[in-house]
């Protein structure tokens, strides 16, 4: 037998703190006491026993004095146990012994025999044997979360398991009446009778050899930690039951995080506020992961301003749910173990991602101001993962604006009037919807069907409040003009200056312009009095022939905006109130630098063309008609109408562009009209041509007469 005067501190092992830490039994034993000399039976064991997971601790009464130095562990016959290694501490009056080598099992108990010399007899020393016991916990009694706080929506709960005998003692007609509840630590500890505890947020249930206690988050003694929108609750709890001959003490520290997890397309995030505790491990799906292994296991931990755990969705399970399309992500349970207040405590939560609905995933509350909805699709947004190469939107005419294969991400910029986007009016909102399709990444090609396809409805809306205008009306507005049937007609004209008062007539072409002289152009809708329509330019360009499709071409306006690759940009001019329907007009000035070559004698005829469309400001495409040139050309191009909806209009005649060194400069007046010199030039050309024709006819007549004369001779 080995006996050491100093040994380990007697703290329960880590396994016990995880699963048994909440239970110890402290009682005065009045069980069988055997003596070698029957006349020397001791009526009671002079001490108490505390039972741990793999050992017991005996605490002797101080009345024993120096006799404790002679205490030892023996077998039931009083013989030394050679394999028993125990620790005797005379100063603390304790003896610690492991169950495995120092006890034997008797009727479901770990039984140990202690002896020490009793020298109260003046004649001879006699040895007294004491049997002390701790219960044997039956295998399989605990579930995987035994010893952990179970978190629910409004309360936390903890379960203490009994052993045979203790359960019988507490199973009387009023088993709960002997219990008292102590909550809090140190000076803040409060002792409550069971009846008081029931009225202050606690509930106790004893059945089937176990005791369950439920604690509301606002119960007496509960400490509340909060940070932002995250909350954590913790309470030290001790239950004491006193009966003749024994005292039962059950203790635990309950801890619970009450907030639901948040989810995005790739991760599930759990947030816990700052509190005096440190995370030790994370357990789920029969895996226990230490903190230093979290990152390698797909879990990212942030510890600044509280604790945040980001779980990759590849770790989560999926299940069919009426709330989600097509699956809901969740963990069947998640156990977090912390070290706090010199204790190891655990809590169990049941996290799952919250979904919007079975038919829609809302891409954003409001559609963008320039008439789009922006959608992000991640490869791991579903399980199994998506094949991003098979993604398509609506009628498949839309292509992704961004593809990031390494991030498993695709972004769409879907126009509200294209790609098959639909709209409807509902509760004062204009709701736009489209559908995204994709195939699963690991789907065998031979099993393609409708069920194998991922479908996600995306939507955004404009509310009626977005269209409100505050006005002060002093008179009734004029009646809305009736809609005029028939095709729309446009015209493109040029003006002498930016007053736009009198355009050039058809007889004034070609209109002459020199270097540094702007060309003032106007596109307008003809023969319409509907104030609700708006003219929107698409493209304007110049060609060297009358054919709008001929090459080369010079861009003037692209997607309704000045051409940003031209150093001499087009200037838009506002349409004032001098016209009845300003929205029926578009005015702009073109710089001649874009067309004139470096040859000082350069002259050229240039033809101007524009494509445009008509917008109905009362219909659902109004946001598109108000798009700003701050949007990139590529984005604006996606909002444009089809080629069938656009109309192309050209100037009635060409513009004659001349450089400063041209010999015709003096022949042009300040208004740009050709003068008599230029008219004489044109007349001279006609006369020369006529003279040539006459000379040709005369030659033919002479040759014919000469031939006739020769034949007559």
UniProtKB/Swiss-Prot annotation:
Residues 636-713 form a propeptide. Proteolytically cleaved before the transmembrane segment to yield the secreted ectodomain incorporated in the zona pellucida. The keyword ATP-binding does not apply. The record marks 167-168, 635-636 as: Cleavage. Residues 464-486 are annotated as: Disordered. It is found in: Cell membrane. Keywords: Cell membrane, Cleavage on pair of basic residues, Disulfide bond, Extracellular matrix, Fertilization, Glycoprotein, Membrane, Receptor, Secreted, Signal, Transmembrane, Transmembrane helix. Residues 1-35 form the signal peptide. The keyword Cell membrane applies. One of its GO terms (biological process) is binding of sperm to zona pellucida. Can form homopolymers that assemble into long fibers (in vitro). Polymers of ZP2 and ZP3 organized into long filaments cross-linked by ZP1 homodimers. Interacts with ZP3. The ZP domain is involved in the polymerization of the ZP proteins to form the zona pellucida. This is Zona pellucida sperm-binding protein 2.
């Amino acid at each position: 037998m080995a006996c050491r005067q100093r040994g380990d501190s007697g703290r329960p092992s880590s396994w016990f703190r995880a699963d048994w830490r909440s239970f110890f039994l402290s009682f005065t034993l009045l069980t069988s006491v055997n003596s070698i000399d029957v006349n020397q039976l001791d009526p009671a064991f002079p001490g108490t026993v505390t039972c741990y997971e793999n050992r017991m601790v005996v605490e002797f009464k101080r009345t024993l004095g120096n006799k404790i130095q002679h205490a030892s562990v023996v077998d039931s016959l009083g013989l030394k146990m050679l394999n028993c290694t125990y620790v005797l501490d005379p100063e603390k009056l304790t003896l610690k012994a492991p169950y495995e080598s120092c006890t034997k099992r008797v009727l479901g108990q770990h039984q140990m025999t202690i002896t020490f010399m009793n020298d109260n007899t003046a004649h001879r020393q006699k040895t007294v044997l004491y049997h002390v016991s701790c219960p044997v916990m039956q295998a399989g009694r605990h579930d995987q979360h035994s010893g952990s706080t179970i978190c629910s929506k409004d309360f936390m709960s903890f379960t203490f398991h009994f052993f045979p005998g203790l359960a019988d003692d507490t199973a009387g007609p009023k088993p709960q009446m002997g219990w008292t509840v102590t909550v809090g630590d140190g000076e803040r500890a409060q002792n409550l009778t069971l009846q008081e505890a029931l009225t202050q947020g606690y509930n106790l249930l004893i059945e089937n050899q176990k005791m369950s206690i439920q604690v509301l988050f606002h119960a007496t003694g509960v400490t509340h930690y909060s940070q932002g929108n995250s909350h954590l609750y913790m309470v030290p709890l001790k239950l004491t039951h006193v009966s003749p001959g024994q005292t039962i003490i059950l203790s635990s520290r309950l801890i619970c995080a009450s907030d639901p997890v948040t989810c995005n397309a790739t991760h599930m995030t759990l947030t816990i506020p700052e509190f005096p505790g440190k995370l030790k491990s994370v357990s789920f799906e029969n895996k226990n992961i230490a903190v230093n292994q979290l990152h390698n296991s797909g879990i990212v931990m942030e510890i600044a301003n509280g604790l945040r755990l980001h779980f990759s969705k590849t770790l989560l399970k999926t299940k069919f749910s009426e709330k989600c399309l097509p699956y809901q992500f969740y963990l069947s349970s998640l156990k977090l173990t912390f070290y706090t207040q010199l204790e190891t405590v655990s809590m169990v939560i049941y996290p799952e991602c919250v979904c919007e609905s079975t038919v829609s995933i809302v891409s954003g509350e409001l559609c963008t101001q320039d008439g789009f909805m922006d959608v992000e699709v991640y490869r791991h947004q579903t399980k199994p993962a998506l094949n991003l190469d098979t993604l398509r939107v609506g009628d498949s005419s839309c292509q992704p604006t961004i593809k990031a294969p390494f991030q498993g991400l695709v972004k769409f910029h879907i126009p509200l009037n294209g790609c098959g986007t639909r709209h409807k009016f509902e509760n004062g909102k204009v709701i736009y919807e489209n559908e995204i399709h994709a195939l699963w990444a690991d789907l065998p090609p031979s099993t393609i069907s409708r069920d194998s396809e991922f479908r996600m409805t995306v939507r955004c809306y404009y509310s009626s409040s977005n269209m409100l205008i505050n006005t002060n009306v002093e008179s009734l507005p004029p009646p809305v003009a009736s809609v005029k049937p028939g095709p729309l007609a446009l015209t493109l004209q040029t003006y002498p200056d930016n007053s736009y008062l009198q355009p050039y007539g058809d007889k004034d072409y070609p209109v002459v312009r020199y270097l540094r002289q702007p060309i003032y152009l106007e596109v307008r809708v003809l023969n319409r009095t509907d104030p609700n329509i708006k003219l929107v330019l698409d493209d304007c360009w110049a060609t060297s022939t009358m054919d709008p499709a001929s090459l080369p071409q010079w861009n003037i306006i692209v997607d309704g905006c000045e051409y940003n690759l031209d150093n001499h940009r087009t200037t838009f001019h506002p349409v004032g109130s001098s016209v009845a329907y300003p929205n029926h007009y578009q005015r702009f000035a073109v710089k001649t630098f874009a067309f004139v070559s470096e040859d000082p004698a350069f002259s050229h005829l240039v033809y101007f063309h524009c494509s445009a469309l008509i917008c109905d400001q009362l219909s659902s495409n109004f946001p598109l008609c108000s798009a700003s040139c701050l949007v990139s050309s590529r984005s604006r191009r996606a909002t444009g109408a089809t080629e069938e909806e656009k109309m192309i209009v050209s100037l009635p005649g060409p513009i004659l562009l001349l450089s400063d060194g041209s010999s015709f400069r003096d022949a042009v007046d300040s208004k740009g009209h050709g003068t008599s010199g230029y008219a004489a030039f044109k007349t001279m050309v006609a006369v020369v041509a006529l003279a040539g024709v006459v000379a040709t006819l005369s030659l033919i007549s002479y040759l014919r007469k000469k031939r006739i004369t020769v034949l007559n001779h």
